[in-house]
Curated annotation (Swiss-Prot):
Its main location: cytoplasm. GO terms for molecular function: 4 iron, 4 sulfur cluster binding; metal ion binding; quinolinate synthetase A activity. It is found in: Cytoplasm. The lineage of its organism: Bacteria, Pseudomonadati, Pseudomonadota, Betaproteobacteria, Burkholderiales. This is Quinolinate synthase.
């Protein structure tokens, strides 16, 4: 069962001082520094991280040079929830989040007493943009009999309206559990991930009609042609992709799952349907293997993302150094919203911990593998 909410056009005109649309995001992407500038910026950032007693946490989708810097300085390169957990558990009182705004907010929710800084506060997410809290709250109010489940890629205010927050590592299990208890569900914001979970679980779900700008552009017909060109390649697909792309996957999962698959599969060649930023970590984890980007457009089409998130691309060495030097671009979350938003996050974490214990206690490796066959970390 799906909602009839009209999908959001992310390249619509955006008023100054509100949110950053696709065109504005690409306009704000920093120019690539020269080799000399890059070396100087990295040295400066390392010194500033030490001076500020700060730690850098970066998402798999930001540019390789930022991922390298996080690894080199004792930081973290991970999925969005692991970024927040790492920041929560680290001794540093200042976290530099290289990613998009909802990631900074999630870090602040889990570490309310820490200072959270971001290279550019305009770095947002099409899923977040496409799920305004006022509209979403009205939608929830219109269906009071349903349990509200939201994906991690949402604002703090939307999380505060939810009963559960999920990542793709545990979303199937949580929805299946809710379905087994007879609960009907509102799902937001990604319609493709929601549809994937709905088909796997058979749950009664109303799907908010949001989508990821990057994953929504992957094309099933062109992917089929690419597979014919490389018949030996395994296909790795993020579940935020359209159904006709997911259907061609050898592995469906998100960032951590897809990296693990690249390591564990015996294949030497992979077609990857997710943000190009992940290829850096895949190449490090599986040297000697070849990774091919899945097609985002046909010959006569143009792409808005070309398989790289424009908001992720707004993170660069220069603005990272600047935020450390000036101490600006701090993330704030209203304490009342933060407290409410933490409840669905903690509920998910508790469920995940209990679920992990149940799986480990089963002692059945074949059963365990089937449980995790098509899911990965958020």
């Amino acid at each position: 069962m799906q909602s009839t909410i009209k999908p959001v056009e992310y390249d619509r005109p955006v008023a100054a001082g509100t949110v950053c649309g696709v065109g504005q995001a690409w306009a704000k992407v920093p120019d690539a520094p020269s080799a000399e500038e890059r070396a100087a910026l990295k040295a400066r950032i390392k010194a500033l991280l030490a001076r500020e007693k700060a730690v850098l946490v970066a998402h798999y989708y930001v540019d390789a040079e930022l991922q390298e810097l996080a690894d080199e300085t004792g930081g973290c390169v991970a999925d969005s929830l692991e970024m927040a957990r790492f920041g929560r558990d680290h001794d540093a009182q200042t976290l530099i989040v290289a990613g998009v705004r909802f990631m900074g907010e999630t870090a602040k929710i889990l570490s309310p007493n820490k200072r959270i800084l971001m290279p550019d506060l305009d770095a947002t997410c099409s899923l977040d943009l496409g799920c305004p809290v006022d509209e979403f709250s009205a939608f929830c109010d219109a269906h009071p009999d349903r349990t509200v489940v939201v994906y991690a890629n949402t604002s703090a205010a939307v999380k505060a309206r939810a009963d559960w927050m999920v990542t793709s590592s545990i979303g199937l299990e949580i929805v299946a559990d809710l379905h087994a208890r007879g609960e009907k569900i509102i799902w937001a914001p990604d319609r493709h991930l929601g549809s994937y979970i709905q088909k796997k679980t058979g749950a009664d779900m109303l799907l908010w009609q949001g989508s990821c700008l990057v994953h929504d552009e992957f094309k099933g017909i062109e992917l089929d042609l690419l597979r014919a060109e490389y018949p030996d390649a395994k296909v790795l697909v993020h579940p935020e992709s359209p159904e006709n792309v997911v259907a061609q996957a050898d592995v469906v999962g998100s960032t951590t799952q897809l990296i693990d698959a690249a390591v564990k599969f015996d294949a030497k060649r992979f077609i990857v349907a997710t943000d190009l930023g992940i290829l850096h970590k895949m190449q490090l984890a599986a040297p000697g293997k070849t990774f091919i980007a899945a097609p985002t457009a046909g010959n006569s089409a143009t792409c808005k993302s070309c398989a790289h998130c424009p908001w992720m691309a707004m993170n660069g060495l220069a603005n990272l150094a600047d935020v450390l030097e000036r101490g600006h671009n701090e993330i704030f979350v209203d304490p009342a919203i933060g407290e409410r938003a933490r409840l669905p996050i903690d509920r998910m974490l508790e469920f995940a911990a209990a679920h992990k214990k149940r799986v480990q206690a089963s002692g059945d490796l074949q059963r365990d593998q089937s449980l995790f066959a098509n899911v990965g970390a958020a």
